[in-house]
Amino acid sequence: SHTTAFAYSSNTNIRVGGFEECEDAQIIINTAGPSIQPGNSRDRMVLLQTNVEVMRETMKKIVSYTRDAILINVSNPMDILTYIAQHEFRYPMNKIFGTGTLLDTARFNKMLADICKVDAKNVTGFVMGEHGGTCFIPWNCVNIVGIPFSEFQSQFELEEPIDKEKLLHEVKVSGLDIV
């Protein structure tokens, strides 16, 4: 799993419910909308028109019950849909989030850990920018077991040098296998 670097929380109860349950919810995770169909473009933007309408319908129902819950949007194109949910429905800015590059970061840390043969929890790196094709990795912020990436390859023998561009490409496209 790409999220193995995240801490496990055994006291979390996740369940599916109707919109009426939003009234008492502390956190709402929105995953509404269709996926990219096999044979279609692997660009998240093909989902835009359909998912904007799905987001609008979903948000109408959510805000009829609450504006107090933390709302986490996962649906794609994530950045645009989160913006629409926040601005069109005036959801409190401090309570609405898109997962952004959080999952991209988890994927990157796991993939780099696998290459370096270390536990993903020992990799610190970030994927930044917009979720999707324009994200980037600030390599000067990456460290592995506390060693800056720029020094890691010379201190530890790897089977082959790390191809930064290839790794970034894999991070970008691996999420599309889920979408």
Q: What does each of the following model-derived ranges do?
A:
Residues 1-26, 34-35:
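Conserved N-terminal Rossmann-fold NAD(P) cofactor-binding segment
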